[in-house]
Design a protein with these regions (language model features):
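Extended amphipathic alpha-helical interaction segments
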Residues: 33, 58, 151-155
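Cleaved targeting-peptide boundary
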Residues: 21-29
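Short N-proximal segments of mature Sec-exported proteins
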Residues: 34-91
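Compact alpha-helical subdomains of small soluble proteins
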Residues: 77-155
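N-terminal signal peptide c-region/cleavage motif recognized by signal peptidases
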Residues: 15-20
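Bacterial N-terminal signal peptides that target proteins for export
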Residues: 1-8
């Protein structure tokens, strides 16, 4: 029984590692490609949520209102990221949720590292980096998604 449990843990870790991503510019994708391709849709959702979580973590103590706004955007997008992952991997919502949050946590840490390096180099988390453009892109994508949700609800 212990061998099976150990094998399961190794397989779970390995599958999560294979699906984990590294940070890269998100702004290179168009809204059209996001809507037409489930894998791109997931990649953008995962990236934006991770970026929002990183900004939340870095700003919440000093600028609580700003941190809370990013946290709210994260909470808005989380279910859609989980659903997108569930769809492309054919997993249950609960399985996809676990994988999703592990991936987001890993990417968030990478964003924080990148932002801290950039902050030391340029005196800003975003100046001289693709991260500022990505943050704008993610904001526009989130705004579009919220609008689509409101329209689908008839509001």
């Amino acid at each position: 029984m212990i061998k099976i449990k150990n094998i399961f843990i190794i397989v779970l870790f390995f599958s999560n590692y294979l699906f984990a991503q590294t940070i890269e510019p998100l702004k290179n994708y168009s809204l059209e490609s996001i809507l037409e391709n489930d894998e791109i849709n997931y990649k953008i959702l995962e990236g934006c949520i991770s970026l929002y979580k990183a900004v939340t973590e870095l700003t919440i103590e000093r600028y609580p209102d700003l941190g809370n706004q990013f946290s709210e955007m994260t909470e808005t997008l989380n279910p859609y990221g989980i659903i997108a992952l569930s769809k492309i991997q054919g997993k249950t919502y609960k399985e996809a949720e676990n994988i999703f949050f592990n991936n987001v946590s890993s990417l968030k840490d990478q964003y924080i590292d990148e932002m801290n390096k950039n902050g030391k180099l340029n005196g800003s988390y975003f100046k001289g980096s693709f991260l500022g453009d990505d943050l704008t892109f993610c904001y526009e994508t989130t705004k579009y998604l919220r609008l689509a949700i409101m329209e689908s609800l008839g509001e």
